[in-house]
Structure formats: structure tokens, C-alpha cells
């Protein structure tokens, strides 16, 4: 049986007694008189009893507030308190006979209120266990270390943190101390792993700068374009070397002129039967047969016009004379054919000198 607090108990006179009954899920208080039959039995809910007690106190305050009497305009008449209470109880009995749905709702709500009140009494304080205390302590320690002002980064240096960082708009969540140590350790491992890769990238950049300095007229910034230009330049150099070796095969030793590149060019042109006044190169179909990557005259012309190649100088046309053969021409005669003396001019000079000598002897 659930006992009600004394605050909710109504005040009964000496001729009445009250009985608590649990009916239809509700706690009801039945007040009965000893000299009243069962037909006059009163059944009230807790809310009704509370309202009755409140109304009774209110009426008492009105009665006793004016000196214990109610004054009328005509004559003064004192109303005993027992008569007022009896009249009020009569009205309550008549009103309880017409119980509607609203009173039932009030009773159910009062029941829930009482049950909640007793449940709050039964709630016991359970102290936290050791694991929760340790977790809470570590979490608070992380907050305390982060708000001290000094924070250790991955390099081992210390920097002063300001309170403005915590009060910024995008406030970052605080990381506990254990998690921060794990992150710092992981970052150091990543830096140690990336140091060989960084050194390798630095070496590659140095070599690419050296290659850019070797290439003529190279102003490329990206590595891919610079490598393409280096490949083209090396291919043209290889073709030039192959052309020079093929040219030396076609020239015979008897037709080679000593002392100077102009003689080898002249001998090369003479050995293949070309004229001296024309361009002193082998035909495209002859050179292209021994050079890879050159299949037609257009490729040959593009190769000869490459800016990285040294152009071959054209020598002056060679005019053979009667007394000067290719095998017995001195170097001065071959290098400067315009300075070769003419036989007619030599005979005229000899005659002039002989005439002068004869005049001197005659004197």
C-alpha cells in the first residue's frame, strides 16, 4: 500500500474517517461519517481533496481577515465556522455526483505526478568507476595542456599560443595529449621516409639545369619540353657525324688536298665528279643511303639547315692551268687561286728586266 504525504491529506472532523482505495488504476480517498449510511458515502480523488483544502483555507482567510465575522449592510451576524464547512461539504458531495471526463483526466495526471515523485526518491547516486575517472582525467589533461600556452610541434621547438586561436570563428576541436603524441610521431616517420625522395628530386633538378646549359638556345622551363629538345639535338648531332664518315669513304687519297678543311671539301667534290662552283655536298640520295631517319631530299635539306650544325664554307672555284696540276699545286696556289702567276705576265717581266740590264751595260 502506497502512503500519501501528509500535505495532501484533508482535515477531517471528529465524526469522520478516511480510507485510501486503489480502484481502476487510481488512488482514491474515501471519507465516511460514523452516523451516515452507505448512501451518503463520499469518494474523492487526491486533486479534489487538494482543491477542497485550498478552498477551505481561502474561506478561513476571508472569515478571520475581518475579525472572525462577516458584516452585512443591515445587521451584523456571526456565522460559525462549522456551518460554513458543512455547507461547503454539502456542495462538494453534490458536485462529486456529476463526475465528468475532465475530472478523470485530472485524477490520472495526479497519479502520474505521484508516481514520478516516488520514482525520484528511489533514484540512487551511483559513483563513477575507475575507467570513467581515468578517461575523464585524460580528457581534462588534454584540455589543460592545450590551454597552457606552450605547444610542442614536430620539430621539437616551442612556440607561444595565444588565446585568439581558441576564440576564432572556426574553432578547431581540442586534441587530447595522447592523440597529439601519436600524430607527432606519425609525422616524423613520414618526414624520415620522404627525405630520400626529396634528395632524389634535388639531384634530378640539378642534372636538368646542367642539360639546359648544354643545349643551345634552350629556354624551356618544364622538364618534358627540355628533354624533347635534347633528344632532337642529339639526333641531329648523330646524323652529322654519320654524314662526315660517309663523306670520307667516298674521297680517294690521291684527290685529297693537304693543309686545311677547304682542301678536303674540294677533294670530296672532285672525287664524286661535281663542279667546283656548286655546293660542295654529296647528293641527298647518296648520303641518305647510309644515314638512318633520312628517306627523301626534304629530310636531307631539313638536316642540313639545322641551326646546331656548322655550315661548310664554299671555296673559290679552282681553275687548272698548264703548269699547275692538282697533284703538284703548292698550298698557296691551292688556297689562293687568284694569286697564281700568268705565264704571259712572267715573260713580259723577264723581257723588261733583260732590257734594263742591257742599258746599264751599254753605259
Curated annotation (Swiss-Prot):
Membrane-traversing stretches: none
Distribution of this protein across tissues and organs: Mainly expressed in fruits and flowers and, to a lower extent, in leaves, stems, seedlings and roots.
Induction, per UniProt: Up-regulated by abscisic acid (ABA) and salt (NaCl).
Region (Disordered): 154-204, 340-363
CDD domains for the chain: bHLH_AtPIF_like
Bias (Polar residues): 340-350
GO cellular component: nucleus
The protein, known as: Transcription factor PIF6
Gene label: PIF6
Amino acid at each position: 500500500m502506497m502512503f500519501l504525504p501528509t500535505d495532501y491529506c484533508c482535515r477531517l472532523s471528529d465524526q469522520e474517517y478516511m480510507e485510501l482505495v486503489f480502484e481502476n488504476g487510481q488512488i482514491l480517498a474515501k471519507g465516511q461519517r460514523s452516523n451516515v449510511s452507505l448512501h451518503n458515502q463520499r469518494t474523492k480523488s487526491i486533486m479534489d481533496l487538494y482543491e477542497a483544502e485550498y478552498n477551505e483555507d481561502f474561506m478561513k482567510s476571508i472569515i478571520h481577515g475581518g475579525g472572525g465575522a462577516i458584516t452585512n449592510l443591515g445587521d451584523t451576524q456571526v456565522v460559525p465556522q462549522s456551518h460554513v464547512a458543512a455547507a461547503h461539504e454539502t456542495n462538494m458531495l453534490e458536485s462529486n455526483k456529476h463526475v465528468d471526463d475532465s475530472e478523470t483526466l485530472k485524477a490520472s495526471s495526479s497519479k502520474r505526478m505521484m508516481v514520478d515523485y516516488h520514482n525520484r526518491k528511489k533514484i540512487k547516486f551511483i559513483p563513477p568507476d575507475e575507467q570513467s575517472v581515468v578517461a575523464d582525467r585524460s580528457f581534462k589533461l588534454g584540455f589543460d595542456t592545450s590551454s597552457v600556452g606552450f605547444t610542442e610541434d614536430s620539430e621539437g621547438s616551442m612556440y607561444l599560443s595565444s588565446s585568439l586561436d581558441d576564440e576564432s570563428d572556426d574553432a578547431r576541436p581540442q586534441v587530447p595529449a595522447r592523440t597529439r603524441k601519436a600524430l607527432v610521431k606519425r609525422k616524423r616517420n613520414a618526414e624520415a621516409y620522404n627525405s630520400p625522395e626529396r634528395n632524389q628530386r634535388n639531384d634530378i633538378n640539378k642534372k636538368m639545369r646542367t642539360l639546359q646549359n648544354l643545349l643551345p638556345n634552350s629556354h624551356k622551363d618544364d622538364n618534358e619540353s627540355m628533354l624533347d629538345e635534347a633528344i632532337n639535338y642529339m639526333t641531329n648531332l648523330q646524323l652529322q657525324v654519320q654524314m662526315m664518315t660517309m663523306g670520307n669513304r667516298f674521297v680517294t687519297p690521291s684527290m685529297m688536298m693537304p693543309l686545311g678543311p677547304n682542301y678536303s671539301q674540294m677533294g670530296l667534290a672532285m672525287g664524286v665528279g661535281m663542279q667546283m662552283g656548286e655546293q660542295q655536298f654529296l647528293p641527298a640520295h647518296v648520303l641518305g643511303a647510309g644515314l638512318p631517319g633520312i628517306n627523301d631530299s626534304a629530310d636531307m635539306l631539313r638536316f642540313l639547315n639545322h641551326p646546331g650544325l656548322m655550315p661548310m664554307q664554299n671555296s673559290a672555284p679552282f681553275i687548272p692551268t698548264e703548269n699547275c696540276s692538282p697533284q703538284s699545286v703548292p698550298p698557296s696556289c691551292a688556297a689562293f687561286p687568284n694569286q697564281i702567276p700568268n705565264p704571259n705576265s712572267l715573260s713580259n717581266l723577264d723581257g723588261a728586266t733583260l732590257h734594263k740590264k742591257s742599258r746599264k751595260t751599254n753605259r
